[in-house]
Amino acid sequence: GMGGQSLRTIRNTEVRHLEEETKISQELIDSLKDSNRAVPIVGYQILGVAPQEYKIGNGLIVEPVGVQTDHIEARFLNIIAHKNMKENISQCCDSVPIEIAEDADDLIAPLALADAVLTPGEKRSGCVLVDFGAGTTTVSIYKNNILRHLAVIPLGGNNITKDICSQQIEEEDAEALKIRFAQAYIEPKENDDESKMYNLDGRCSINAILLEDIVEARLNEILDNVSNQIVLSGYENKLMAGAIITG
């Protein structure tokens, strides 16, 4: 599926003023969706769309077909990425050849992951799915069974490895030290042994407290960015199902 640092979501609103109070038809909804898809975004391409709600009068509804109104405001969340991303993937598949899905939504990796990992209850109650990768961390936020926000943070496990490398350790050994000894959280102790070393089969070693500090610092940076994305989404106090972590 399609992922990467350029993948993110932006909001858009399409409005229709009707000459008289009319029952909303599926054709009108399709027209609003087409207008949203046609909005130009310089340097980017719309890969998928998550309709949010439709504002009719003072209310917000998800299924507006059949409702009487003379004014409708459609709110969309567009999933975008650099223009050449889909083209590059298509060219790679053509050269193999591999048949790709016709529905672009099926190609968006975070959406496919959410469908595989999250329960309907979690999506309905509201949750944030955090996917820790090697080079990136992807944040997907759901509420009322609708994708509300998606962002890719350009930080991941590789950054921790590089931080360990800064201690004059080869990358392969740094990765092995991370996998074998690193922990996301360590219970504070009053009498930590400052001389304790983590040894990698005699090839290299690192002070245990130093490794813990390196990992903690980078993870705090990543989690601060995740927290910031939750705030930017506007749903920080509405995620009753909490956070689901994968990666």
For each feature predicted by the language model, list its residue ranges:
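A short acidic Gly-Thr/Ser loop motif
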Residues: 1-3, 129-136, 142-143, 154-158, ...
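Nucleotide/phosphate-binding catalytic cleft detector across ATP-hydrolyzing
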Residues: 2-128, 146-148, 170-171, 182-212, ...
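Residue-level signature of catalytic and energy-coupling elements of molecular machines
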Residues: 93, 131, 164, 226, ...
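Active-site lining segments that contact anionic ligands and/or coordinate catalytic metals
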Residues: 136, 226, 238-242
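Residue-level detector of high-confidence beta-strand sites
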Residues: 150-152
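A conserved active-site cap/scaffold subdomain adjacent to cofactor or substrate pockets
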Residues: 154-170
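Feature representing long, continuous alpha-helical segments
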Residues: 162, 209, 213, 217-224, ...
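Small-residue helix-packing motif on alpha-helices
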Residues: 174-177
